[in-house]
Regions:
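Surface-exposed acidic, glycine-flexible loop patches that form ligand/cofactor-binding
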Residues: 109-111
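Histidine-bearing beta->alpha loop at or near hydrolase active sites
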Residues: 156-158
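Glycine-rich nucleotide phosphate-binding loop and flanking beta-alpha elements
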Residues: 90-91, 126
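N-terminal beta1-alpha1-beta2 submodule of the flavodoxin-like/Rossmannoid cofactor-binding fold
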Residues: 1-86, 92-107, 160, 164, ...
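Generic, ordered loop/turn and secondary-structure boundary motif
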Residues: 92-95, 113, 153
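Short, glycine-/small-residue-rich phosphate/pyrophosphate-handling segment
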Residues: 113-151
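Short beta-strand elements in bilobed, periplasmic/extracellular small-molecule ligand-binding domains
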Residues: 32-39, 146-154
Length: 178
């Protein structure tokens, strides 16, 4: 059975990116897939922690935080066959809560390599407004040596009809993962 780890980042409860992630997850459940989801943007005060490195010349070693990301999220991602990243667009980039979790991959680059990936983003702007993110995700995907299974860039997410169409695409993408 395929194991899937979903990471979302929006701090908006029931926001547009949550709707996309929910639809994707419903599609996954059609195939009884083993799913773990972490909503980084909806965590309490102090979660998630940012990457911290030891202060040693020539050494770039992360300082373990023993927080939720370290104890639960990273182990679930290490077990996962597919990693799904879902963000909202903030100032032409992924949001900070989401980025904080991605930065924590640093100590696990080798263990996380060669997985499959899905990326989804929503934004109130245009496709062009998401160009920087598209480059960022392409570079992350190459660096991690992940196989891209699909991408959805949901522009004009304020438009409920358009968002519903993107949510349907997310559902179908989730359903396609076996």
């Amino acid at each position: 059975m395929t194991k899937v780890g979903i990471i979302t980042g929006s701090p908006h409860f029931n926001g547009a990116s949550q709707k996309l992630a929910d639809s994707f997850e419903w599609g996954l459940k059609e195939n009884y897939t083993n799913i773990y989801r972490y909503d980084a943007g909806l965590q309490g005060e102090g979660e998630p922690h940012f990457l911290q490195l030891e202060n040693a010349p020539g050494m770039e070693v992360g300082i373990p935080n023993h927080d939720l990301v370290e104890r639960k999220v990273i182990p679930k991602l290490l077990e996962a066959d597919v990693i799904v990243l879902v963000s909202s667009l903030y100032y032409f980039e992924i949001n900070a809560q989401f980025k904080a979790v991605i930065d924590r991959f640093y100590d696990y680059n080798h263990e996380l390599k060669d997985k499959k990936m899905v990326f989804m983003m929503v934004g109130y702007g245009t496709q062009e407004d998401m160009d920087a993110v598209k480059l960022h995700i392409r570079k992350l995907n190459q660096y991690m040596r992940w196989q891209m299974l699909g991408e959805i860039y949901a522009d004009d997410s304020w438009n409920e009809e358009k968002l519903a169409n993107f949510a349907k695409k997310a559902y179908e993408l989730g359903k396609s993962i076996k």
